[in-house]
């Protein structure tokens, strides 16, 4: 008789220890031996109850002790044993991202369970760094430790206010520090950082070596499918003036891909993830970043003080529900919900979004995608356009967009701006107060099949063009 594992969701998973696609007596024997001899509480009790705790692997959670190694062991064990990982109340300090793998459930005691990054250290590089280099020279090495996670990212020459564009980002682990020559050696090459669209680049002098990193991350050649994260507080511990680091959202899913503007080839896959009842604060980039194929459900989360976006969906992404969340930005940049490069079949419903540059946006380099619904949300004190869909082009048109029944307070710029959009409905939206009266409330240009009706909009002498529909056709 063969006993299966039982997960928290009641699923039965028969162990395939040898990863050969078959379950055999040898597998079961190896599993029993492993359960009896492995350090920690990985025994029959752990497998039968369907969960393990990070405390079983030595995590302290006192906000002082570095819990990185203990947390890594617990994450690895949970993935290996197909059991849930419980993180009890406490503050767990880490200095490297914790790796998510397929089928993992990670949960805690709500806001009482905090995973917090060690404060980031960064220095501007003093030399041009080749794309395959393993050694970086920095102006100073104070604050670095062997074993730290580190990234190379573009600072855009603007370290004083943290406006770094953070392109060409590379991840490694510091393996050696030479205090004589101010050099840092790290494991792994930089060719993942070949550029957003696959063009090989050298890292110029205006790049930064930074210990900023994601907290929970899937970024490898391994598949990551069906992760469930809930009831945790993740603190990115972003420092004042810290340069942004792309790929360093508090939760970051990113498959190994080869990509350009017209073609995306996945070398691994990531999809079907649930994030619920989490508090995500002080991120070095996005609160949640999902760069995989799709299938994302973010529900009842609080996201505060992200350096960039609240929730970021991208790279030919489809099928998402972002519902019931409260997102607060930093007024300078980013969007509450960011549609990046052809997002389709996303429902943005019942969220409260404030203090971002945009409420919902395809800002940067994407089209608007198709068949997206933005409804029943509350937006307040958005610095620029509340709904910004201006990045579609004549040759890569967006469309199938429904924006309805949203409420906006503290309007400072245009309510809705879009171009090269087809089949758009903008209806029953209400502006309840205005901070700065824009000259154009709605701007939809070079578009076809646009319905604008039933909205409650402000009026005033400064509104010279309530609706700008230049070069648009079939406008209702």
What are these model-derived regions, one by one?
Residues 23, 101-103, 107, 134-160, 169, 179, 215-247, 268-281, ...:
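Parallel beta-helix/beta-solenoid
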Residues 54-88, 142-147:
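Acidic Gly/Asp/Thr-rich repetitive segments characteristic of extracellular carbohydrate-active
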Residues 113-194:
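Autoprocessing Asn-cyclization modules and mimics
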Residues 14-47:
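Alpha-helical segments with a strong preference for the paired helices of cellulosomal dockerin domains
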Residues 83, 95-97, 110-111, 116-119, ...:
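Short glycine/acidic-rich loop motifs that flank beta-strands on beta-rich extracellular proteins
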Residues 84, 95-117, 176-178, 200-203, ...:
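Beta-solenoid repeat scaffold
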């Amino acid at each position: 008789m063969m006993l299966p594992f039982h997960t928290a969701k009641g699923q039965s998973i028969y162990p395939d220890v040898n990863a050969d696609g078959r379950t055999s007596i040898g597998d079961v024997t190896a599993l029993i031996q492993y359960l009896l001899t492995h350090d920690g509480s990985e025994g029959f009790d752990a497998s039968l109850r369907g969960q393990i705790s990070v405390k079983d692997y030595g995590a302290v959670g006192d906000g002082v002790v570095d819990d990185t190694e203990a947390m890594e062991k617990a994450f690895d064990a949970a993935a290996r044993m197909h059991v849930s990982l419980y993180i009890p109340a406490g503050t767990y300090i880490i200095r490297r991202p914790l790796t998510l793998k397929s089928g993992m459930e990670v949960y805690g005691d709500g806001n009482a369970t905090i995973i917090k990054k060690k404060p980031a250290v960064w220095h501007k590089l003093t030399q041009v760094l080749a794309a395959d280099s393993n050694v970086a020279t920095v102006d100073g090495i104070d604050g670095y430790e062997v074993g730290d996670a580190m990234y190379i990212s573009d600072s855009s020459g603007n370290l004083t206010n943290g406006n770094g564009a953070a392109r060409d980002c590379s991840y490694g682990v510091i393996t050696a520090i030479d205090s004589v020559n101010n050099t840092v050696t790290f494991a792994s090459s930089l060719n993942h950082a070949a550029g957003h669209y696959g063009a090989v680049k050298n890292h110029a002098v205006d790049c930064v070596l930074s210990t900023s990193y994601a907290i929970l991350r899937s970024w490898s050649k391994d598949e990551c499918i069906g992760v469930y994260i809930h009831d945790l507080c993740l603190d990115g511990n972003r420092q004042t003036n810290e340069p942004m680091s792309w790929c360093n959202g508090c939760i970051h899913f990113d498959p190994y891909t080869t990509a350009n503007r017209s073609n995306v080839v996945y070398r691994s896959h990531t999809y079907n993830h649930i994030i619920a009842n989490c508090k995500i604060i002080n991120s070095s980039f996005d609160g949640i970043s999902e760069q995989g194929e799709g299938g994302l459900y973010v529900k009842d989360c609080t996201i505060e003080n992200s350096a960039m976006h609240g929730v970021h969906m991208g790279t030919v992404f489809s099928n998402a529900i972002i519902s019931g969340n409260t997102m607060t930005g930093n007024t300078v940049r980013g969007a509450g919900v960011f549609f990046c490069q052809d997002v389709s079949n996303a429902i943005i419903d019942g969220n409260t979004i404030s203090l971002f540059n945009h409420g919902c946006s395809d800002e940067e380099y994407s089209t608007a995608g198709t068949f997206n619904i933005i409804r029943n949300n509350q937006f307040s004190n958005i610095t620029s356009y509340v709904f910004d869909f201006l990045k579609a082009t004549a040759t890569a048109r967006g469309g199938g967009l429904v924006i309805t029944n949203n409420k906006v307070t503290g309007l400072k710029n245009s309510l809705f701006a879009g171009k090269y959009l087809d089949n758009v409905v903008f209806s029953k939206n209400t502006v309840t107060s205005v901070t700065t009266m824009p000259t154009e409330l709605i701007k939809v240009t070079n578009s076809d099949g646009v319905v604008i009706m039933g909205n409650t909009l402000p009026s005033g002498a400064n509104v010279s063009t309530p609706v700008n529909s230049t070069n648009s056709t079939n406008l209702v």
